[in-house]
Every structure is written in structure tokens, then in C-alpha cells.
């Protein structure tokens, strides 16, 4: 199954969303982009998976407009987070503590990032969360990151 994003980049999916379970999940990573975010938000199965992941203590990362999915799921009340600047009001309405000046925010089970420009920092936060700070630093150094 080929999924094509808003920038016309195709990604081969391992399986259809309907077949996804959380049996071996360490983290859900929600991609940004308005079209994809709209699609995820309108999918009852995706929203159920996200709520179930949270209930099971599975970490969830979201970048760009994707933190609004977490807001729609009712999961951000009192949580520190960030998203694409044009979408911050949606997070505030959901009771989130918006950190508009941050590129990446980690709070509890959530890692949120502002936009594609924060993707390096977002990736390192994910590595640090799933592995270790040392692993994140090792990757950062090996790719000559900023």
C-alpha cells in the first residue's frame, strides 16, 4: 500500500491502518501536514488506536499540525506541547499548556514538535526516549548534526 503525502512523496506502508495493533508498540509517531492530519483525525480507527495507546502508557510523538490530533482525542489537557504556529489556538482550546517558543516539547507520554524545521531535534528526542541520551548523542555526532 503506497501512501502519498502532500509533497507527492510516496511511502510504502507495511499494512493498512485497519490491521495495526498496539501489541508490540513502543511509540506512535504522528506525521504532520494538514491533509494527513485531517485524514487521521477523521479515522475512527486511528483515533481509537491513539486513545488506546495513551491508556496503555505507550508514548506518542507528533510534529507540525499532528498535535491537534491529540487535542481532538482529548489527551492534552494540562500537558505542555507545541505545534505548527497556525494551529496553536486549537491546542489552547483543548486545555494544553502551549510552549510556542519551543521547537520540541516533552511532557509525560508526549513528544511534540513545531514543524519540519524541528525534525532533527524531534528525532533526537524520540531516540533519547526510546533508547537513551547517549544513543541520541551518538546519532547526533555520527550525522554531524547542528
Each model region followed by its residue ranges:
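Extended, subdomain-level signal for the structured scaffold at the beginning of enzyme domains
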Residues: 1-60, 68-72, 77-78, 90-101, ...
Amino acid at each position: 500500500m503506497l501512501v502519498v503525502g502532500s509533497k507527492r512523496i510516496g511511502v510504502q506502508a507495511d499494512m493498512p491502518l485497519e490491521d495495526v495493533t498496539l501489541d508490540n508498540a513502543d511509540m506512535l509517531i504522528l506525521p504532520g501536514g494538514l491533509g494527513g492530519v485531517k485524514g487521521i483525525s477523521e479515522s475512527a480507527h486511528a483515533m481509537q488506536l491513539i486513545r488506546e495507546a495513551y491508556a496503555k502508557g505507550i508514548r506518542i510523538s507528533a510534529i507540525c499540525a499532528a498535535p491537534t490530533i491529540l487535542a481532538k482525542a482529548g489527551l492534552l489537557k494540562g500537558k505542555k506541547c507545541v505545534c505548527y504556529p497556525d494551529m496553536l489556538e486549537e491546542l489552547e482550546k483543548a486545555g494544553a499548556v502551549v510552549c510556542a517558543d519551543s521547537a520540541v516539547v516533552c511532557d509525560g507520554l508526549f513528544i511534540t514538535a513545531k514543524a519540519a524545521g524541528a525534525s532533527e531535534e524531534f528525532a533526537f528526542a524520540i531516540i533519547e526516549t526510546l533508547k537513551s541520551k547517549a544513543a541520541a548523542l551518538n546519532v547526533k555526532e555520527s550525522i554531524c548534526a547542528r
